């Protein structure tokens, strides 16, 4: 299973791990998403502001998601893609709860590796993983990707065909940081599209939230080893 997903990512820039977690586990994660999400301002398609429940830098605020962030199956995939160098390993760059609601402005196509000033060659600097809490469909704003674009050195062309990634709750989407992608637009006022996001980088790169994801040294020193090793 893991080798097949790594091959998907190598060939297409993204891979899907079907049924990464069962429904009972996802129901627990759904409750945790409600617990840790707060209202944040986002922009609607019409330019007006909207308050959306989401969360940023989860790993610095709670231990409730550590089992996912450090899941051995996920780490095995990430290490195959990021090819860690020596003692540097891989590090958590960002974690959060994504929530695509009706009317939310869809972001532009982008590459996560563009956080850094030079595009990676051979292996990416980063890998993003999205755990579907709700179903991903076109009408609720499923993530859109341009297959194979992780091999490009050029920018994406607006005419390029993007594919919506359809997921069931519990499925895991893993994306090479060089892949051009964006969240879709949710046109269903009665549904949301939530996902727990974890974004890893090569250990020698600067993480998005800085060393230890911004945690004070005292808090960091008390972390369980299963998550501490990735911070």
Where are these regions (language model features)?
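Non-heme Fe(II)-dependent double-stranded beta-helix
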Residues: 1-12, 17-109, 115-116
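Non-heme Fe(II)/2-oxoglutarate
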Residues: 47, 179, 184-231
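Catalytic core of non-heme Fe(II) oxygenases with the double-stranded beta-helix
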Residues: 104-167, 205-215
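Histidine-centered metal-chelating micro-motifs
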Residues: 115, 173, 178-182
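Short Ser/Thr-interspersed hydrophobic loop/turn segments at strand-loop and sheet-helix junctions
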Residues: 98, 135-136, 178-179
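A structural signal for short, well-ordered beta-strand segments
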Residues: 94-97, 129-131, 196-200
